[in-house]
Amino acid sequence: MRAGVKPVLIRQHEERTPPGLLVEWLRERGIPFEVHPSWDGSAAPDPADYSFVASLGSPYGPNDTHEPGVVEELKLIGAAVEKEIPVLGLCFGGEVLSAVLGGRVERAPVPELGWREIETDDPGTIPAGPWLEWHYERFTTPPGAVEVARTADAVQAFRIGPHLGVQFHPESTVEIVAGWAGADTESLAELGVEDGRDLLAISPEREDAAREAAFRLFDAFLEAATDRSENSAGAAGGKE
């Protein structure tokens, strides 16, 4: 994969979960992109037309196959994996990536909502955070993948080939957090975050560090995907 030859495909699954810092990073790096909403009834694009696919969060999970958009995303990410198009899965996107690779997605014993430190085996790629978590389900590390990060309650990141799946939201911004907190007041109260006010108060203080960590993660993903693609192309070119 050579950044800039093809655009990045961003799959957005609900209006309140936009690509946020991911788009900011792409613009800063000069990488073209297209945002495709999965709820507007349009046909899913061919992942082969893109340099990589980023799949964002969703109110649904991969097991909600009664939802046409979920089935469509499973097919699209499955096609990307089959065609060796790198996939960056963020929360729901990471769950879908795990599912198509043979992992399991299940209800988490407790939802993770808010800023959380994670245990990471590769801080150069995935810093310890804190990262913004907002999920009620969790994935397992699929067969053949390497678990990179975790909390006590969930696997937080895995990689396999050019693909990276994470359970947290590196793309989140203060504005995105405010939207989620307003919609999930009841869940936040159950977890001791009264009306989301604590979360809203602390998020601006972490904005700069979160942006730096997110850009490091995105850069590392792109570098690994690019190196793998170039090595594969070189190996193919050497065959007679």
Enumerate the language-model features and the residues they cover:
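N-terminal beta1-alpha1 ligand-phosphate binding loop
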Residues: V8-L26, W39
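Amide-donor transfer/coupling interface in amidating biosynthetic enzymes
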Residues: I10, E106, T120-E240
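Glycine/Thr-rich phosphate-binding loops of Rossmann-like dinucleotide-binding domains
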Residues: P18, N63-D64, S98
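Residue-level signal for inorganic ion chemistry
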Residues: L26, C91, F221
